Regions:
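Long, charged, mostly alpha-helical binding arms that flank functional sites
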Residues: 253-332
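Residue-level signal for inorganic ion chemistry
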Residues: 22, 51, 82, 113, ...
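A glycine-rich helix N-cap at a beta->alpha junction
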Residues: 78-104, 109-110, 117-120
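Active-site cores that bind ATP or allylic diphosphates and position pyrophosphate for catalysis
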Residues: 68-70, 76, 98, 112-275, ...
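Secondary-structure transition/capping motifs at alpha-helix termini
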Residues: 21-25, 53-61, 85-95, 220-221, ...
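N-terminal catalytic cores of NTP/NDP-binding nucleotidyl/phosphoryl-transfer enzymes
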Residues: 6-83, 199-230
Length: 557
C-alpha cells in the first residue's frame, strides 16, 4: 500500500485523503472549464488530461463547462473547436454545460448577498476602484458607496440588470476586507454592466458575472468535488472559498479548489493576445497553422492524440512551474508515429535516374511492407520502371568509402527493388547533373530468394517511378521562434524572434498510393521524416506537412 501511495501525484493524494475522510466515490466529480474566446493550446492539454484522466481513474463524471461570462470575446466557433479538440484527444465528457446556464441563480445569490450586507453597488469608474485597492503593503481605501443602504444597492442592482445604465458606469462589489494583504479580497467586483449580446442568451442580460464569482459557484451548482486550475489562481482560493461559504448548504459537497503548475513549452507562446497578433500580422495563416501551439495546429501538423497524452504523462503533475523542452514533445510524437505511420516513398529533391539495361516500356509492381513495427500492417505494391527519381543527395560522382549511397562505379540497393550500379551522368551547360545513368542486376530483386538478391551492398536508397509518380508539395515546418522563451523579455517585442525559415516548401514526387491517403493520416516518408496530408490538398495538388524529423539525438531523462 505504501508503494502505491508513492506513485500518486499530489492531486491524486488529495483525492485519496478526501475519500479516506468521508467523501464517497459517488461524490467525485471533475470539470474542464475553458473560456470560449480562442482555440485551445498546448497548455490546455495538461488541464484536459488531468481532469479527464482523474475521471477515468476514479470512474467519475467530468463536465465540459464553458465559462462564457464575457460576451465581448466569445463565439460559437470557439465552442465548436474546443469540443472537437477534447474529443480528438480521446476524452468523453458527462455533460456539456455553460456558466450562462446559471446566470439567474448567480443573480439571485448576488441579491441575497446584498440583503445580508455583504455586497454593494459602486458607482465609481474601474480606474478609481483599482487605485483605491492600493498594494499588498498598503491598506486600501474604502469606496464612498461601501456602506450605502441595502435598499439602494438592491434597487440599483435591479436597474443595472434591466439595462438602465451605461456599460462600465456601475459595478456590484463584494464587501470583504479592504485591508487584506490578498488583493483579491479587497472588495472584488462581482458584476459589471456590459450592453453586449451574448452568444447564447442574446440580449436578455445587461450585466455579467466576473470570473471569480461565476466560477466557484458554477462548481458548487454542478457539485464538482475538486476544482483543479493552474497556479496563477492560487491566491484566488481564499475568495473562491469566501464566495462558497456565502451560499453553501449543509449536506452538499463542498467543492475545493486546488492548483497545479502551468505547462510552458520551449519555443512556444500561449498568450491568446499574442497568438491573435501572429494571425493579425499574417505571421501565420490562422489558429490551425501547423506552427501554432494550438491543438488544432498540432493536429494539422500531424501530431497524434496518443503522443500528446504520452507527453503530458511524462511531464507529470507538479506544483512548481518550469520550462518543458519542445524536444520531449517531439520525442513522444516520433515514438508514436514510428509505431503507427505507414512507410511510403517520396523524393523531395528529385533527380532523374535511367536504368539503361532495363527494357524500355516495361513496368512491374513490387511488393513492399507498410510498417515493419506492426505485424498486421501488411504490404502494398509499388510501380517500378526504367526511369526513376532519386534524391539528389543520394548520388555523388566521386566519393570516399564512407559514402554508402550511389556513386559512379558503385552499387546500391533500391529499396524493395534491385541492386543498381552508377555508370555515367549527363550535365547541363552549368555543369549541373540532370540525369544519372545506371545498370541493374536483374536477378537481384528483393525477396526473390536468388543468390544475387541476397548479395550485400552497403547502401539502400528510396526512389519513385517517374512514369507513375505524383507531384507533391512538401511543407517542411520548423520552430516558429528562434529562442526558447520568445516572450521572456517584457521590453522586447516577441515578433523579433520569428524564425524566417519556420516553413520551407519544396516540390517533389511520390509513389501513386499517396493520392488516396486521407487528410491527417500519419506517414513516414522513408529516410526523410514523418508527414501528413494537409487539408489544402485538392484532387490535382497534393500537399504534405512535415510533422517531425525522422531522428533526433534527444533522449528523455
Amino acid at each position: 500500500m505504501e508503494e502505491e501511495k508513492k506513485s500518486l501525484n499530489f492531486i491524486e493524494q488529495i483525492i485519496e485523503d478526501d475519500l479516506a475522510n468521508g467523501l464517497t466515490k459517488d461524490e467525485l466529480r471533475f470539470r474542464f472549464p475553458p473560456e470560449p474566446n480562442g482555440y485551445l493550446h498546448v497548455g490546455h492539454t495538461k488541464a484536459i488530461c488531468i481532469n479527464f484522466g482523474l475521471g477515468e481513474k476514479y470512474n467519475a463524471p467530468v463536465n465540459l463547462r464553458f465559462d462564457d461570462t464575457n460576451p465581448e470575446k466569445e463565439e460559437q466557433e470557439f465552442v465548436d473547436s474546443i469540443m472537437k479538440d477534447v474529443e480528438w484527444l480521446g476524452f468523453k465528457w458527462d455533460k456539456v454545460l455553460y456558466a450562462s446556464d446559471y446566470f439567474q441563480q448567480l443573480y439571485d445569490w448576488a441579491v441575497q448577498l446584498i440583503k445580508e450586507g455583504k455586497a454593494y453597488v459602486d458607482e465609481q469608474p474601474s480606474e478609481v476602484i483599482t487605485e483605491q485597492r492600493k498594494n499588498p503593503a498598503e491598506p486600501g481605501i474604502e469606496s464612498p458607496y461601501r456602506n450605502r443602504p441595502v435598499e439602494e444597492s438592491l434597487d440599483l442592482f435591479e436597474r443595472m440588470k434591466n439595462g438602465e445604465f451605461e456599460s462600465g458606469s456601475m459595478s456590484l462589489r463584494a464587501k470583504i476586507d479592504m485591508t487584506s494583504p490578498n488583493m483579491n479580497m479587497r472588495d472584488p467586483v462581482m458584476y459589471r454592466i456590459l450592453n453586449k449580446p451574448h452568444h447564447r442568451t442574446g440580449t436578455a442580460w445587461k450585466i455579467y458575472p466576473m470570473y471569480d464569482w461565476a466560477h466557484g459557484e458554477s462548481d458548487y451548482i454542478e457539485q464538482v468535488s475538486h476544482s483543479l486550475c493552474s497556479l496563477e489562481f492560487e491566491n484566488h482560493r481564499p475568495l473562491y472559498n469566501w464566495y462558497l461559504d456565502q451560499v453553501y448548504e449543509e449536506g452538499k459537497v463542498k467543492n475545493k479548489q486546488r492548483e497545479f503548475a502551468r505547462m510552458n513549452v520551449s519555443y512556444m507562446i500561449t498568450s491568446k493576445r499574442k497568438l491573435q497578433r501572429l494571425i493579425a500580422e499574417n505571421v501565420v495563416s490562422g489558429w490551425d497553422d501547423p506552427r501554432m501551439p494550438t491543438i488544432s495546429g498540432m493536429r494539422r501538423k500531424g501530431y497524434t492524440a496518443t503522443a500528446i497524452r504520452n507527453f503530458i504523462e511524462k511531464v507529470g503533475v507538479a506544483k512548481r512551474e518550469n520550462l518543458i523542452e519542445l524536444q520531449l514533445l517531439e520525442f513522444c510524437v516520433r515514438e508514436d508515429l514510428n509505431k503507427v505511420a505507414k512507410r511510403v516513398m517520396t523524393v523531395v529533391d528529385p533527380i532523374k535516374l535511367i536504368i539503361e539495361n532495363y527494357p524500355e516500356g516495361q513496368e512491374e509492381w513490387l511488393e513492399t511492407e507498410n510498417n515493419p513495427e506492426q505485424e498486421n500492417a501488411g504490404t502494398r505494391e509499388i510501380p517500378f520502371s526504367r526511369e526513376l527519381y532519386i534524391e539528389r543527395e543520394d548520388f555523388k560522382e566521386e566519393a570516399n568509402n564512407k559514402f554508402f549511397r550511389l556513386k559512379l562505379g558503385g552499387e546500391v540497393r533500391l529499396k524493395s527493388a534491385y541492386i543498381i550500379k552508377g555508370e555515367r551522368v549527363e550535365k547541363d551547360e552549368n555543369g549541373e547533373i540532370t540525369t544519372i545513368y545506371a545498370t541493374y542486376d536483374e536477378k537481384s530483386k528483393s525477396g526473390s530468394g536468388t543468390e544475387e538478391s541476397l548479395r550485400k551492398v552497403k547502401g539502400t536508397i528510396h526512389w519513385v517511378s517517374a512514369k507513375h509518380a505524383i507531384p507533391v508539395e512538401v511543407r517542411n515546418y520548423d520552430k516558429l521562434f528562434t529562442v526558447e522563451q520568445p516572450d521572456a523579455e517584457k521590453d522586447v517585442d516577441f515578433l523579433n524572434f520569428i524564425n524566417p525559415d519556420s516553413v520551407t516548401t519544396v516540390q517533389g514526387f511520390a509513389e501513386p498510393s499517396l493520392k488516396d491517403v486521407a487528410v491527417g493520416e500519419p506517414l513516414q516518408f522513408q529516410r526523410i521524416g514523418y508527414f501528413t496530408k494537409d487539408q489544402d490538398s485538392t484532387d490535382t495538388n497534393f500537399v504534405f506537412n512535415r510533422t517531425v524529423t525522422l531522428k533526433d539525438s534527444y533522449k528523455p531523462e
